[in-house]
């Protein structure tokens, strides 16, 4: 699981200390503890604008979201891609009479856009828990079709965040985790074949991935 590397990077702690080697199924109580301090939280105390964009994979309950752990803004997905594609798979139990409301009970959250706030919202969201000091919007599921372009969304939002911080004269810390090159790889239709003859969807998407990284560098 990529959770181990992500957690070590953002917390500066070993997986043996945090227990964040992997997370469970959607809605599982496994993920970022409220007691864990991130580099984002420390930098925010020093006046930094802090943003996280793209894949998180450190737990999907509200108290585990990046905007509850030092980030001013988060826009991204919370799982490995195959988990988010499962509801579109042929054998997913959407309408099984012996498994009613399966997706509502066990399915993944969509792409989340959240902001840290000073107001403690006591609202309890079914499955995901108390909102807390953040504003949370589910922008819709990360479908196989959206996977073609979701990194473009994340990079665009990250670039806007950086430019706004610069305009405000604030130092910034931005953590960008694209979904590419994770399984499964869904290239944009216009990108197919761009890597040349005998190449694959993976190679075609890698070119788009490199382009997105360059957009962040020039922000």
Region annotations inferred by a language model:
Residues 1-219:
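Formylglycine-dependent sulfatase
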């Amino acid at each position: 699981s990529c959770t181990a590397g992500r957690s070590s990077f953002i917390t500066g702690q070993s997986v043996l200390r945090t227990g964040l080697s992997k997370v469970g199924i959607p809605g599982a109580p496994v993920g970022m503890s409220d007691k864990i301090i991130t580099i984002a939280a420390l930098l925010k105390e020093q006046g930094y604008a802090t943003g996280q964009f793209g894949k998180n994979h450190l737990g999907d309950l509200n108290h585990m979201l990046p905007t509850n752990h030092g980030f001013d803004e988060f826009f991204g997905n919370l799982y490995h891609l195959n988990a988010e594609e499962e509801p579109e798979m042929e054998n997913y139990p959407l309408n099984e009479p012996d498994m009613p409301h399966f997706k509502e009970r066990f399915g993944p959250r969509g792409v989340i856009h959240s902001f840290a706030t000073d107001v403690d919202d006591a609202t309890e969201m079914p499955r995901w828990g108390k909102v807390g000091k953040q504003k949370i919007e589910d922008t819709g599921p990360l479908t196989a079709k959206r996977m073609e372009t979701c990194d473009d969304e994340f990079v665009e939002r990250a670039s806007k965040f950086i430019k706004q911080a610069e305009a405000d004269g604030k130092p910034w810390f931005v953590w960008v985790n694209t979904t590419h090159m994770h399984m499964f790889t869904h290239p944009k239709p216009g990108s197919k074949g761009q890597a040349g003859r005998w190449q694959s969807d993976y190679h075609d998407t890698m070119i788009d991935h490199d382009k997105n990284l360059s957009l962040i560098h020039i922000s």
